[in-house]
Structures are given as structure tokens and as C-alpha cells.
Regions:
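Charged, compositionally biased boundary regions
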Residues: 53-209
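Compact beta-rich and alpha/beta scaffold cores in large eukaryotic transport/transcription complexes
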Residues: 32-33, 51-52
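Short, extreme N-terminal segment that most often corresponds to the first beta-strand
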Residues: 2-31, 39-40
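Ser/Thr- and Asn-enriched, surface-exposed coil loops between beta-strands
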Residues: 42-44
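Secondary-structure boundary/capping signal
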Residues: 36-37, 81
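Short, intrinsically disordered, mixed-charge
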Residues: 33-34, 75
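Structured loops at beta-to-helix junctions and adjacent beta-edge loops in soluble globular domains
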Residues: 19, 50-51
Length: 209
């Protein structure tokens, strides 16, 4: 695929961040039904890196797939799961925690917010983020950027939406999240998988059955 093609049609991808150590995540990961790389992602966090079969081969929307995965993991474990996802048109997240209704937010490709402010506040509360400093940073992610889409190619490449996800991760570093090098929002499943396999201590989860 040429550089121009990859810019015009970014590949869908996702990351599943779990607020638990890798051993705890590996114990419930078979619920997802397919093996995937699992690496540490900071203090008390781990990340699963899906290969993307359901949306690459089965044609299912990436957000629907990872929302279901996050909910399945969270119901089977005592810790929350944060799914980050993106495709050519949008990007967003879903936070699942126990049997509570998952909460999520969406940005359009050019970074325009397309979610509800209350969802972001619920997100912050469930993760125990600072109600002042972190809440202010998250609130800025729900504001429309007057320059959204003005940069040539920004809307086409989904750069604005990916920048919003990076902003979200910047806030979450204060909650302990540190993604390994190469696990960047906006990359396709192939590149994410290659980056995960290069992380020291990577392990593969098992598939159910």
C-alpha cells in the first residue's frame, strides 16, 4: 500500500487496556476467544493488542467488537477495561467496569467531538481521576477545535481523532498508564502486533477451549 493510500484510508485498530497485572489479565483473556499479545502498560496496567480478525476478515465494526470484548473481560474480573479504537471515520473509547453499563466517547476523523459530556465525567469518576485537574483536561477533549479539519489531510487521515486519543492517554499517564513504544493510536493491527511482539516480556494469551 502506498503512503498516499495509507493516509487516505487508515486501517482500523484497537488496544484493550486493563487495570491489572499481566498474570491477572491472562487468566480471563480466553473469554475473548482468540489469542493476542499481552504486555505491561505502566504501573498496575496491562494492554492486550488484538490482531483484528473480526473487523479485518469478518467485516464487523471495530468499535462494536472491542466494546463487547471490554464488557466480557470486565464482567469476569474485578478491574476495569478501557478499549481504545479507531477507523477511517472515527475514534473513541469504551470503559467497562463490572456489571455497570459501559461508558464511551467518540470523535469524528477531524477531531470533532461526537459524544456526551456526561460520559466523560462518568469515565473520570470510575477511574478515580482527579476531579479538578484531570477533569479539566478531559473537558478540553470534549470541546470543538475551531481549527479542526483545516490542516490539509487532517480529516482524511483521521489525525484529529487520533490526536484526541493521544490527549486522553496523556491524562491517563497520571493514573499509571504508559504504553510501550510503537503502541500508538491510529496504527493498524499489523503494526501494533509487530510492536507488541518486540516488547520485552510479551506473552500470548490463550483462546478458550
Amino acid at each position: 500500500m502506498s503512503t498516499e493510500e495509507s493516509m487516505s484510508a487508515p486501517a482500523p485498530g484497537a488496544l484493550l487496556l486493563c487495570r491489572a497485572e499481566p498474570d491477572s489479565v491472562a487468566a480471563v483473556a480466553p473469554l475473548l476467544g482468540e489469542p493476542m499479545p499481552l504486555v505491561r502498560a505502566g504501573d498496575g496496567w496491562s494492554v492486550l493488542v488484538p490482531e483484528g480478525g473480526p473487523w479485518r476478515d469478518g467485516g464487523e465494526p471495530v468499535d462494536r467488537v472491542v466494546t463487547g470484548w471490554a464488557a466480557a473481560l470486565a464482567v469476569g474480573a474485578p478491574w476495569p477495561v478501557l478499549a481504545l479504537w479507531w477507523d477511517a471515520d472515527r475514534a473513541g473509547y469504551t470503559l467497562a467496569s463490572g456489571f455497570r453499563r459501559p461508558v464511551g466517547y467518540v470523535w469524528l476523523a477531524n477531531g470533532t467531538p461526537a459524544g456526551e459530556d456526561e460520559a466523560m465525567r462518568t469515565f473520570a469518576a470510575r477511574l478515580g481521576l482527579d476531579p479538578v485537574l484531570d477533569a479539566q483536561s478531559l473537558d478540553r477533549l470534549t470541546r470543538t477545535d475551531p481549527d479542526a479539519g483545516r490542516e490539509p489531510g487532517a480529516a482524511r487521515a483521521g489525525a484529529g481523532a487520533r490526536a484526541r486519543l493521544r490527549g486522553l492517554l496523556a491524562v491517563l499517564t497520571r493514573a499509571g498508564i504508559t504504553l510501550p513504544a510503537g503502541l500508538d493510536p491510529g496504527e493498524g493491527a499489523d503494526r501494533l502486533g509487530a510492536a507488541a511482539r518486540a516488547v520485552p516480556g510479551v506473552r500470548w494469551t490463550e483462546a478458550a477451549g
